[in-house]
Amino acid sequence: MVLWGLLGALLMVMVGWLCLPGLLRQRRPQEPPLDKGSIPWLGHAMTFRKNMLEFLKHMRSKHGDVFTVQLGGQYFTFVMDPVSFGPILKDGQRKLDFVEYAKGLVLKVFGYQSIEGDHRMIHLASTKHLMGHGLEELNKAMLDSLSLVMLGPEGRSPDASRWHEDGLFHFCYGVMFKAGYLSLFGHTSDKRQDLLQAEEIFIKFRRFDLLFPRFVYSLLGPREWREVGRLQQLFHELLSVKHNPEKDGMSNWIGHMLQYLSEQGVAPAMQDKFNFMMLWASQGNTGPASFWALIYLLKHPEAMRAVKEEATRVLGEPRLEAKQSFTVQLSALQHIPVLDSVMEETLRLGAAPTLYRVVQKDILLKMASGQECLLRQGDIVTLFPYLSVHMDPDIHPEPTTFKYDRFLNPNGSRKVDFYKAGQKIHHYTMPWGSGVSICPGRFFALSEMKLFVLLMVQYFDLELVDPNTPVPPIDPRRWGFGTMQPTHDVRIRYRLKPLE
């Protein structure tokens, strides 16, 4: 009994110690409105976690375009005016940090212990190998991998034109993940075994993916924590650098980064964890984004017609003979403005990343309105462009409606002029983040999604099992984690177009 009493007293002291900073914190002059919530230390964490979008809508209506909220003992200052994003993203005073925050996150999620300079190394490797000639080579590898995944090792089979049924999300995610994995991490001489391994990794990845949001928020139960640990260990083994000698065709991008880590003395076991991190970064969003692109095309026949007409005009009539693989003139990916607009509109509606910057020293932020806000050292400045940019009706009229030509000028060129309150705005969409946290692989990600959509509209017949099926809603549990996922899948039928 004495022991339990001592433990209870100790627990009360610990809880009190955790809650004390939140209880004592008060709003200082020039600081944004402070909303600590009614629960000590937790603050608004549970409401935020339940539906981030609705929570931020409520806070903005209550406090305006800038406010600070308490979430699990940490204070986040949300800036909701996109015209005021510039000073935060450029950070000329070097008082806002992203790298240290990211290091803590990747250590928790992937087990990777960052070293000095590796954030810069990733961006340099991406500039060299995911743009220009490097991107051309990777696009070729991706086309080969898509052919392998979608057609099999022998190319088009005699019964390839029979109908298949699947969930569209499962289909898109599976194809994009497996093809992307093989393109980046390499393959062996046994193509069938490569496909089996890619399928195994995809199944495990999807399980980790389902647990991911609650894992990041530390909301897993004991059994789920153990499962996450097992999955992490499994990925470290499956992606181990010890398997590299067995593989051909590892991308120069991955090879460049692993060579750097080796030269810096990073142990092979830590390189395995780096590979897991890069698998997530490269494959966690392209499949879901491809799903949204195809479901919008299926639900908007005028958009589907426009994409097909453009594809035929640029690529010609497709023809896939028996035992052939897909052939696409990859340079055409730079000359398809209609599909570019479709993808940009898809990402506007379906990509919802959160941008974080940790305040290193007190800083005065001047808003576009002229208001000056004092940001406190240790707080986290947060941008959520989905709400403040993508869904702003001033920037994008009818923001919840899919318009395939939203990003096209009347002459068919790309539209880049968007306005808020009559002022031209630089950040009119932000699906890839921005500034130091912009996605370094965005050009390859966009290329592989465009390539997949082109293959689907050119070589396949694709239809909804139920033509009246609506576009499914977004799963609110994933707000803030890159490309969103649907609450449920949608059944489709697909087949290779018959040979004439």
From Swiss-Prot:
Does Metal-binding appear among the keywords? yes
Tell me a GO biological process for this protein. Answer: positive regulation of intestinal cholesterol absorption
Q: What is its EC number?
A: 1.14.14.139
Names of the cofactor(s) = heme
Q: Which GO terms describe its cellular component?
A: endoplasmic reticulum membrane
Query: What Gene Ontology molecular function terms does this protein carry?
Result: heme binding; iron ion binding; sterol 12-alpha-hydroxylase activity
Which residues are reported to carry the modification Phosphoserine?
Answer: S325
Subcellular localization(s) per the UniProt record: Endoplasmic reticulum membrane; Microsome membrane
Q: Name one Pfam family in it.
A: p450
Main enzyme class: oxidoreductase
| Pathway annotation from the record | Lipid metabolism; bile acid biosynthesis
**What is the designated name of this protein?**
7-alpha-hydroxycholest-4-en-3-one 12-alpha-hydroxylase
* Organism, scientific name: Oryctolagus cuniculus (Rabbit)
